[in-house]
Amino acid sequence: TYDLGTPWEKPVLRDVSLILDPGQAMLITGDNGSGKTTLSRVLTGLLVPTWGRVTLGGRPMERCVGDVALSMQFARLQLQRPSVRSDILAAAGHGPRIGTGSVHRKGAISREEGDRIVDEAMELVGLDPALATRGIDDLSGGQMRRVALAGLLASHPSVLILDEPMAGLDVASRDLLISVLDERRRAGLSILVISHDLEGMDSLCDTHGRLAEGVLS
C-alpha cells in the first residue's frame, strides 16, 4: 500500500508471490498503473511492503545490498555523475553513489583498474570506450540506457531487475542487449524484466507473468 498522508491507504500490490531461481529470466508485463514500477522498487528495497517480505538466498533484502541491481525505466535518473566513466564506476561500487538505489561500496582502485572496468563494461554493451570521457547529456537516449546497464553489470549482481529495458533502443541495440543478458543468464545471473509488452524479451525469458491491478498471474 501507499501512505497518502491520510487515514486511508492505496493498495498497489495484492498477494504477489514469485520465486526467481539462479540463471532464470522472468518477464512480467502489465498496463500502466498495474503496479509494475512499485513491484520493482519493492524487490530492490527502495520501498518497504506493508505486508510480506522479500528475500534473496533466504536473507532479508536489507542484508543484500549490492546483490540486486535495478535498471530504471528512465536511464537519465540513474546517471548523475559528470562523465560516463564516473557513472559506471559509481554504479560498480567504486565511488560515492548519488540518487536512488543502494550500491555496496568496494573501496578505492587504481586509475588503471578503473579504466579496465569501464572499458570492459562499455564494450560489453556495444559502446566505444572512447565515450567514457563524455558528459552524460552529450549522449543519446539509447546510449544513456546502455551506460546505465554497463554500470550495473560491472557491479556483478546476483539479480538484475530491468524496468522497461527496451525504451529508446533501436533494433540492433535491442538484439545486442538480449544477447548480453542471455550470456549473463547462462552464467547464473537471475533476471527480472518488467515491461508493458513483450518487446522481444520473450526470447530471453523462460517465464512470463501478467500484472493487473496489483495481482500477478
List where the protein language model places each region.
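A short, flexible loop at the N-terminus of ABC-type nucleotide-binding domains that lies
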Residues: 1-15
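Helix-to-loop junction immediately C-terminal to a conserved catalytic motif
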Residues: 44
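Conserved ABC transporter NBD signature motif
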Residues: 52-65
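Conserved ABC ATPase "signature" region
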Residues: 112-130
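Conserved ABC ATPase signature
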Residues: 135-139
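ABC ATPase C-loop
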Residues: 152-153
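Catalytic Walker B motif of ABC-type/P-loop ATPase nucleotide-binding domains
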Residues: 160-163
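H-loop/switch region of ABC-family ATPase nucleotide-binding domains
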Residues: 195-196
